[in-house]
A protein has these predicted regions:
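Glycine-rich phosphate/diphosphate-binding loop of Rossmann-like nucleotide-binding domains
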Residues: 65-66, 70-76, 161-234
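Adenosine-phosphate binding glycine-rich loop
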Residues: 269-270, 275-323
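Phosphate/diphosphate ligand-binding glycine-rich loop within oxidoreductases
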Residues: 49-157, 280
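Phosphate-coordination loops involved in phosphoryl transfer and adenosine-cofactor binding
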Residues: 55-60, 167-169, 269
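Short, structured coil segments at secondary-structure junctions
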Residues: 82, 113, 133-135, 193, ...
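Rossmann-like adenosine-cofactor binding region
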Residues: 210-287
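Positively charged, low-complexity intrinsically disordered leader regions
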Residues: 10-73
Length: 323
């Protein structure tokens, strides 16, 4: 590594938290520190040699109790770029299916001298429970419909690269808000940065408490698009729906699907985002997802740098790592 890179990382402050459980536990300085660190790691992963020895001899376990493609691979790649030893856990092949509790499962894994745990779980609050009950650094990779902090961090980071400082910028979140951990984490992150936030979707998919957070609500997508600088499109989370929240997918597409025809009606270019997985032809057409307005693949790329930054900063604070 170049000496300038080492000095940049070494002089950085510490996060205010010992775990990453949710954006709601972070402050504005934490966000800026994570983004600045991600800038440094983005330079690293664009070099021919993409690894740094920062987390050598640190072991990280990835515990995913829900399906994941982007997040799981992104965390694993980030950990390996930092030279950590990585364990990948699959709940479908574990003793959880034999009735073992989450705490017992994690404590057994930690007895193998694991230092950090990245967890995705269907139960809201599972990462916080672990942080209180086990002796390891915990990173929340998504807990039910509660939070998905690293997704919100990479989303804000990607927005800033496109439109600069988010203060007073108009950010729109469209779709299934009520079941989305991405939406809630994004709202917390955007509020810390002084952005104006509006959500759009059927009333049945928008939680009423958002208005108490100062979030504006719009049920007309065309009006919302005219207002926004960025539109973050969310999929319908059918796996979390026990009731009928809208008449049909066809009806949903008609009123809330993002098409090029809709974008052509407004007199400005807006940035299009999506956390994935995309249901093409439902919340967004392929033409829009693959257009010059879209930064969906940039979000995925930035996810590695953001997760490297989060992992590194927590290790720096908790294990006295500075290289």
């Amino acid at each position: 590594m170049e000496i300038t890179y080492i000095l940049k990382i070494w002089w950085m402050e510490n996060l205010s938290v010992d775990h990453l459980l949710g954006i709601k536990f972070l402050n504005q300085n934490d966000l800026e520190l994570i983004f600045e660190t991600a800038d440094n790691f983005k330079q690293v992963i664009n070099r021919p040699i993409k690894k740094v020895p920062s987390l050598r001899d640190i072991t990280i376990a990835n515990l995913f109790f829900e399906n994941s493609t982007r997040t799981k691979l992104s965390f694993e790649l980030a950990e390996k770029r930092l030279s950590a030893d990585v364990l990948n856990f699959s709940s479908s092949q574990s003793s959880v299916n034999k009735g073992e509790s989450l705490i017992d499962t994690v404590n057994n894994i930690l007895s193998m001298k694991v230092d950090m745990v990245v967890i995705r779980h269907s139960n809201p609050g599972a990462p916080q429970l672990l942080s209180e009950k086990v002796n390891a650094t915990i990173i929340n990779a998504g807990d039910g419909a509660h939070e998905h902090p690293t997704q919100a961090l990479l989303d804000s980071y990607s927005m800033r690269q496109e439109i600069g400082d988010l203060r007073n910028k108009n950010i729109l979140i469209v779709g299934d808000i009520i079941h989305s951990r991405v939406a809630l984490s994004n709202i917390f992150a955007l509020q810390l940065q002084g952005a104006n936030i509006k959500v759009c979707g059927p009333n049945t998919l928008i939680p009423k408490y958002l208005r108490d957070f100062g979030v504006k609500v719009e049920t007309n997508l065309d009006k919302a698009l005219e207002w926004c600088d960025v539109a973050n499109m969310l999929r319908l989370q059918n796996e979390r729906m026990s009731d009928s929240f809208f008449p049909s997918v066809r009806e949903y597409k008609k009123h809330f699907g993002l098409t090029m025809e809709r974008l052509d009606k407004i007199n400005k270019k807006i940035v299009i985002m999506h956390p994935g997985p995309i249901n093409r032809g439902v919340e967004i057409t392929s033409e829009v997802a693959d257009s010059n307005n879209s930064i969906i693949l940039e979000q995925v790329e930035n996810g590695v740098a953001i997760r490297m930054a989060v992992i590194y900063l927590l290790a720096k604070k908790n294990f006295d790592r500075w290289i």
